[in-house]
């Protein structure tokens, strides 16, 4: 998941420590993004272990994927995630990274198939937290029925990041005959909404600011592609779908 790093490697370790296993101190180091043996180990022991598959394990610079059938179209979307805190009731930044892009692709009427994932890690980030995030991402990808097939990793100096940033991009196939878009909306159309408005945003904010509420708050982040497929199967009356960002329902 990545070949190069623009930052100099300045790990304060003794000669020979690398051969003993770079994950022994359970912290992300600059060398994990250098493109050398340290990067190979974090790829093997964290990323491949969490969501290795045939395409990813080939280790090529790009994943080569099947072309869509005649009449089908590709849907392509990308999103970046910079949530603080990274862990909150109902999920973590890894679940958001999978669900966000899967849902962005699905709302175009597409069947999401493949994802890429790019990590920007801060030096000193706990390896246990990174493994936990990757495990959640793998679990959520299985839930959505998609595969992580390519990725990249970079490490920035301590103090130049917020622990972990994640970018995911997704590709899906739009079946022949499916066409959704805001230009198709008409006056009088009904706008159904899934779930309780505001749950994801207020859950993260309450954790970040130390707020307490009488009700138990949980982020309801979930891959919606299977639900969307059922909605579209009901008939041609669905004109437009949107996956609003947290705290942005009004502007959507």
Language-model segments: residues:
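Helix-biased detector of long, well-ordered alpha-helical tracts
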Residues: 2-252
């Amino acid at each position: 998941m990545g070949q190069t790093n623009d930052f100099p490697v300045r790990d304060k370790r003794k000669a020979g420590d690398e051969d003993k296993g770079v994950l022994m101190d359970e912290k992300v180091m600059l060398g994990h993004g250098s493109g050398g043996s340290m990067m190979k180990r974090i790829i093997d022991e964290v990323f491949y272990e969490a969501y290795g598959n045939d395409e990813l394990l080939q280790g090529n610079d790009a994943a080569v994927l099947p072309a869509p059938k005649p009449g089908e179209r590709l849907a392509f979307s990308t999103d970046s995630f910079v949530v603080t805190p990274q862990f909150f009731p109902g999920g973590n930044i890894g679940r958001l990274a999978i669900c966000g892009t899967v849902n962005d692709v699905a709302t175009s009427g597409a069947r999401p198939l493949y994802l890429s994932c790019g990590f920007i890690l801060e030096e000193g980030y706990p390896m246990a937290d990174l493994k936990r995030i990757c495990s959640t991402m793998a679990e959520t990808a299985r839930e959505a029925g998609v595969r992580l097939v390519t990725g990249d990793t970079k490490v920035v100096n301590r103090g130049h990041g917020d622990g972990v940033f994640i970018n995911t991009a997704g590709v899906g196939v739009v079946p022949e005959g499916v066409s959704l878009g805001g230009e198709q909306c008409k006056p009088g159309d009904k706008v159904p909404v899934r779930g309780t408005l505001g749950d994801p945003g207020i859950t993260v904010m309450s954790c970040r600011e130390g707020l307490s509420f009488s009700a138990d708050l949980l982020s309801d982040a979930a891959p919606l592609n299977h639900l969307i497929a059922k909605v579209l199967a009901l008939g041609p009356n669905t004109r437009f779908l949107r996956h609003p960002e947290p705290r942005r329902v009004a502007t959507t």
